[in-house]
């Protein structure tokens, strides 16, 4: 492969990455804790887009904090795992070229 082809490949990768990022924005990852008493949803960019807390937790601050931390951590992990998968898929597509 010569260097003129490499530029075209890189441009193609940039375009594919932009398309994946745009699609990823619409992906929603939801995590729950406390048997569903706390639910958080993140978009693919890692932005918190929804938070639900059962009314019964409003009287128990400590439990709410624990459930909230658990749900948030699980949500962040799901977003990161999705990002890794997208990156590996993109690299796999590049290797095929």
UniProtKB/Swiss-Prot annotation:
Keyword Phosphoprotein included in the entry's annotation: no
Annotated Gene Ontology cellular component terms: bacterial nucleoid; cytoplasm
Gene3D superfamilies: Nucleoid-associated protein YbaB-like domain (3.30.1310.10)
Major subcellular site: cytoplasm
Compartment annotation: Cytoplasm, Nucleoid
Pfam family, one: YbaB_DNA_bd
Keywords of the record: Cytoplasm, DNA-binding
Source organism superkingdom: Bacteria
A GO molecular-function annotation: DNA binding
Similarity remark: Belongs to the YbaB/EbfC family.
General function of this protein: Binds to DNA and alters its conformation. May be involved in regulation of gene expression, nucleoid organization and DNA protection.
Binding partners and assembly: Homodimer.
NCBIfam families reported for this sequence: DNA_YbaB_EbfC (TIGR00103)
Annotated protein name in UniProt: Nucleoid-associated protein HPP12_0031
Organism: Helicobacter pylori (strain P12)
Lineage: Bacteria, Pseudomonadati, Campylobacterota, Epsilonproteobacteria, Campylobacterales
